[in-house]
Amino acid sequence: MGLTLPTTDLNDPDIPYDTYMEWFGQIAAMNANTVKVFTVMNPDFYNAFADYNEKHPENPLYLLQGIWFNETYMETVGDAFGENGKIVQAFERACTETADIIHGNSDYTSYGSIENAVYDRDISKYVAGYILGLEWQPDFVTNTNKNNAERKAYTGNYLKTENASPFEVFLAQTGDTLISYETKTYSAQTPVAFLNWSTTDSLTHSNEPFPEEDAVPVDTEHIKAKPEFYAGLFAAIDLYPYYPEFINYQPEYVDFIDFTEQSNPYRAYLRDLKKQYSVPVIAAEFGVPSSRGIAHESVMGYNQGGLTEQQQGEYTAKMAQDLAREQFAGSMVFEWQDEWFKQTWNTVKYAPEDSEKRTPNAQSAEQGYGLLSCEPGKTKSVSCPDGSLSEWDGDEPVYKDEKTRVYVKTDEGYLYLMVKLVGTASPEECHLYLPISLGGNGSIFAGREALIFSDPADFLLELNGKKETRLLTDAYNDLFYYQYAVEKLSLIHISEPTRRRGIS
């Protein structure tokens, strides 16, 4: 579960109690039994979680509680032990604060706009485990190992290391701090995992095309529980079917044929990875988004975007089955609700930072993971392309002639067009062009279509049946052309895109 509603952000992730209660009921209704959160939530989350479970004692929900530190430290500090232990101190403080919150004993933690948030509900009996950390950037791990070569081992009250790297020593030390604090303060222990992802897994992927994606391992098998830690360790790994690229290129994965007689590199990777662990392993995240935009592709078709909601559901179910068949101890679908603040590498530069100006972006794959779709509109969208025209009743056309009427609606997410044809022609038989002008910087012609417009057009919508309908853009608005040809590959050297080159 994410932290935000569509129009809130990480600075003030305000979700009300009633919303959480509704969500917990919906989550339980789909036969899920555990909710994972990345970090401390607002007090209403824990209040609602406690109340929901008290009302449903026979089928309670369980919690996997994430603990992290400010991820910008990975860049600004660059070393887990750097700047006199700045990250260590922040991470250990987050651990002890989280333990206090879980045991309902905190009124000193600030949360968003709440300066002293009160956490007074003890939900510890419902906590299945703590998951410590972030998706570690390889250069952060490498720098930590390089700068702290003398930190070869750690032995604490409840955890110790064997053949560990300095970065793994950092994790062991932090985990031991959490376990020691919870044991001493609350006479309680909770299972602990250290978050990992495929980029820093303990395997070597010889066919990974990008060296940074297989540069350094984080092997939590080097961290061992001492006999005094009764709750024990488990492993938590984010596992996606499209990233990193090795999953598309590693021959032994691509050549793996599952019981459906289809290639299944995802399951092959799961099997390979599971063998590396002596503790229970869960998928801390897995899933695919139903966004229009695509950020990564999978040889299985399990792409990061470009999927229908039906495909999203089917692929998610198949991955859950693969995880179960490979005897993972559990799997957490990413994620419960759509979040509008999230961006992918190919959209982040063009997204507003102000949450009040934020809109859903169908081009951003990160916004389409939610099982719970968050659509524009306070109660409902102004239009839905479902074949019903009832929401257009009473609207005046913005354009009309003897054969055509064009109607327009807008909301936070989309521009809706409804074209009504006068006469006997069916939509399948019509071939129409609709030029769309946004700011007057477009083109007055579309060369390939031999069209000339009375005013500059930024986009051209061609309606030509189910298979040939398309939306064309003026070259000036082609973001991907600019990103690749100009910024990334330097194939073209220009100070700004040339305007009015034509729509194509």
Specify the residue positions occupied by each region the protein language model found.
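Active-site-adjacent substrate/metal-binding segments within catalytic domains
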Residues: M1-E54
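Aromatic-rich peripheral "rim/lid" segments of glycoside hydrolase catalytic domains that contact
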Residues: I294-G301, G306-L307, Q311, Y315, ...
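Single conserved hydrophobic/aromatic residue that forms the stacking wall/gate
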Residues: I492-I503
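A solvent-exposed, charged loop/short amphipathic helix patch at secondary-structure junctions
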Residues: G85-T96, V141-V169, Y249-F259, I294-L307
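An active-site-proximal structural segment forming one wall of the substrate-binding cleft
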Residues: F24-A29, N42-Y46, D51-E58, F81-E135, ...
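Surface-exposed, glycine/proline- and aromatic-rich loop segments on solvent-exposed faces
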Residues: P397-L489
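Glycoside hydrolase catalytic-domain groove-lining segments
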Residues: N207-V299
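Aromatic-lined carbohydrate-recognition surfaces of secreted/lumenal glycan-active proteins
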Residues: D107-Y119, S165-T220, I237, Y266, ...
